[in-house]
Amino acid sequence: LPIGITTSLKGTLMAIFDARYDSSRDLQGDIDIAMMRSLDGGMSWQPMQIVLDRKKWGGLPEKYNGISDACILTDEKNGTIYVAGLWMYGVLDPRSGKWVEGMTQDSTRWIHQWHAKGSQPGLGVKETCQFLITKSVDDGLTWSDPVNITAQTKKPEWWLYAPAPGHGITLKDG
């Protein structure tokens, strides 16, 4: 099931969802934000494309660079499509809340940001999930490099940061 759906100003239907490769569990894991486009109101769909993927960022395998809980919206003024998601880098120790060094593809440690000390106060990638946003100006065919807007949207003293997935809104005043 899609997490979010929007219709572009050109009438293209876009559905976004988590592409979970290794398991059905939530972050942390090898998860990307994927999208499918329909040009005929949902009767048929183009192949899945990946919209947000951190790959092996920071030297960690993809299973420790997961992105989940996407939100999509169409800017009704200029037609730009935005997709945002939560990126979790590495793993925090559930007892100490400290970032675990040396994670590899063979590592089996896992903690969800909502459990124990899986998320911490602060803004850094080794403290808390990061809020990333990408945009498309060509009706969802291509996407910009992700921009990290965590420092603009999360207060450093917050422990847990989890903007909800779904469909975003635009306001008349911007």
What are these regions (language model features)?
Residues 1-174:
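Asp-box/BNR beta-propeller blade signature and adjacent active/binding-site loops
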